[in-house]
């Protein structure tokens, strides 16, 4: 891991609606931090495809009005 990442801390930033998310964002799903790979929208919600630190793929579905925890790296 690079020295830059080692000096940064992962912090909770906000609860976001799926329409506020974008590819590359870090979210928390089932007590695991994952990166959003792809988002697709249909008539009532969003398919969100993710990848974890072990390179395992995942999928969640969120309705338009659901929120999810969004995390960012914060430099100390």
Language-model regions, residue ranges each:
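Extended hydrophobic/Leu-rich segments
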Residues: 5, 10, 34-36, 48-49, ...
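Intrinsically disordered, low-complexity, charged/polar segments
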Residues: 2-4, 8, 57-76
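Generic structural motif
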Residues: 32, 39, 53, 65, ...
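Basic/aromatic-rich interaction segments and small domains that mediate binding to polyanionic partners
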Residues: 37-62
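Short, charged beta-turn/beta-strand-edge "cap" motif at the junction between a beta-strand
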Residues: 16, 32-35
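Mixed-charge, Lys/Arg-rich low-complexity intrinsically disordered regions
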Residues: 2-22
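Short, hydrophobic/aromatic-rich segments at coil-to-beta transitions
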Residues: 22-24, 46
């Amino acid at each position: 891991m690079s020295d830059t990442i080692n000096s940064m801390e992962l912090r909770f930033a906000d609860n976001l609606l799926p329409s506020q998310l974008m590819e590359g964002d870090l979210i928390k799903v089932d007590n695991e931090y994952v990166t959003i790979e792809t988002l697709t929208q249909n008539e009532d919600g969003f398919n969100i495809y993710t990848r974890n630190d072990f390179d395992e793929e995942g999928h969640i579905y969120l309705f338009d009005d659901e929120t999810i925890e969004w995390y960012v790296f914060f430099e100390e």
